[in-house]
Amino acid sequence: MAKINDNYLKLKAGYLFPEIGRRVRAFAAANPEAKVIRLGIGDVTQPLTPTILKAFHDAVDDLASENSFMGYGPEQGYDFLIDAIIEKSYKPLGVDLKTTEMFISDGSKCDCANILDIFALDNTVAIGDPVYPVYNDTNVMIGRTGDADDKGYYKGLVYMPCTEENGFFPAYPKEKVDMIYLCFPNNPTGAVATKAQLKGWVDYALANDSIILFDAAYEAFITDPSIPHSIYEVEGAKKCAIEFRSFSKTAGFTGVRCGLVVVPDELEGTTSNGEKYSFNKLWLRRQTTKFNGASYPVQKAAAAVYTEQGWKETQANIDYYMENARIIREGLSAAGVTVYGGVNAPYIWLKTPAGLTSWDFFDKLLNDCHVVGTPGSGFGPSGEGYFRLSAFGNRDNVVEAVERIKKNLKK
């Protein structure tokens, strides 16, 4: 009889967002008249912009003609998109990349999971707490951990608490680690990292022969010119870091699916016999074996983001969401709620009212306000007592949700 991958059985029951969905569906079934406003999972609400949509349509039309039809594309991505990203998104930061160092994908969630294919299982991994669940769960699935303890920490992973006391920025691990997940602007806390803070991590990684897995999915929401958009703005980072980016929130591609990974040529790991080997070559080999590339229409649409008009439209949507963040942050703060994030990041991280756990507050908002958020404890034990709200909602719904919450908390 075929055996299963028992590592999946170590996972806590239900991925965070499906559990939220289950509770919301149950509430909606019991209260069909209720207008539920969802500010939980970070899905966007604004449509694709006209320039992006036209590029999409034109690319689909290309597939309708024998003369312009496109079949299998390059697994690494089309040069027209890679070149546009390097020219428009990295060069202005002072970061020079080769086209061979960038890989286009169908989204950064997949990349954050798939990157584990090129790392040995006996590497020691450090992740933040609270953390985007994908970092934690994919390491469990692949077999890098033991079982979870009563708090939810998995044996074999090093957890770095990100708390109110340390400004939601992790301290360096006391033990030796080989791989470090960093996400800035952060999901779920909305915290950002200064260049000096990132330099500290780069210096740490170089000194300890560690690799940083840097998730920059929300870099487009940074407005403070002093906050770095890429870890490669720090000298030496190409020798110790892989960077992930996404079009999901930046350009509304949550249903379109497109992302990218940067694996610098300078980045090397060690083989089992102690020799150095290129991670770039390993990732290329992995992609050419397991991935056929993001679709041609998707990559054409993504490239349109970097045209002058395309970026103007994209920035307008980003501004729309950041205004939502301001409304949530200032509205709840005025109601006496302690809030973090929502500046340079599209997530608001708030403290739950005294005496309420994260899931208690979830149920309170759902039942009393008909508003859905995300319990902080779902992101890790250090998230207990906190709650995440997303700025990706429709403006009218955001305003109404904030008013409902304020009214309820004043009772």
Swiss-Prot record:
Superkingdom of origin: Bacteria
Annotated binding of substrate, by residue: Y15, G42, K109, Y132, N187, N292, R388
Protein family according to the UniProt entry: Belongs to the class-I pyridoxal-phosphate-dependent aminotransferase family. LL-diaminopimelate aminotransferase subfamily.
Pathway the protein takes part in: Amino-acid biosynthesis; L-lysine biosynthesis via DAP pathway; LL-2,6-diaminopimelate from (S)-tetrahydrodipicolinate (aminotransferase route): step 1/1
The keyword Disulfide bond is assigned to this record: no
SUPFAM superfamilies the UniProt entry points to: PLP-dependent transferases
Database matches in PANTHER family: AMINOTRANSFERASE
UniProt record, GO biological process: lysine biosynthetic process via diaminopimelate
Coiled coil regions, renumbered to chain: none
Protein name: LL-diaminopimelate aminotransferase
Cofactor: pyridoxal 5'-phosphate
Function: Involved in the synthesis of meso-diaminopimelate (m-DAP or DL-DAP), required for both lysine and peptidoglycan biosynthesis. Catalyzes the direct conversion of tetrahydrodipicolinate to LL-diaminopimelate.
Gene3D superfamilies per UniProt: Aspartate Aminotransferase, domain 1 (3.90.1150.10), Type I PLP-dependent aspartate aminotransferase-like (Major domain) (3.40.640.10)
Keyword terms, alphabetized: Aminotransferase, Pyridoxal phosphate, Transferase
A GO molecular-function descriptor: pyridoxal phosphate binding
Residues modified as N6-(pyridoxal phosphate)lysine: K249
Pfam families with a match to the protein in the record: Aminotran_1_2 (PF00155)
Binding site for pyridoxal 5'-phosphate: Y72, S108, K109, Y132, N187, Y218, S246, F247, S248, R257, N292
Binding partners and assembly: Homodimer.
Catalytic activity: (2S,6S)-2,6-diaminopimelate + 2-oxoglutarate = (S)-2,3,4,5-tetrahydrodipicolinate + L-glutamate + H2O + H(+)
InterPro entries the record matches: Aminotransferase_I/II_large (IPR004839), DapL/ALD1 (IPR019942), PyrdxlP-dep_Trfase (IPR015424), PyrdxlP-dep_Trfase_major (IPR015421), PyrdxlP-dep_Trfase_small (IPR015422)
Source organism per UniProt: Citrifermentans bemidjiense (strain ATCC BAA-1014 / DSM 16622 / JCM 12645 / Bem)
Enzyme Commission number(s): 2.6.1.83
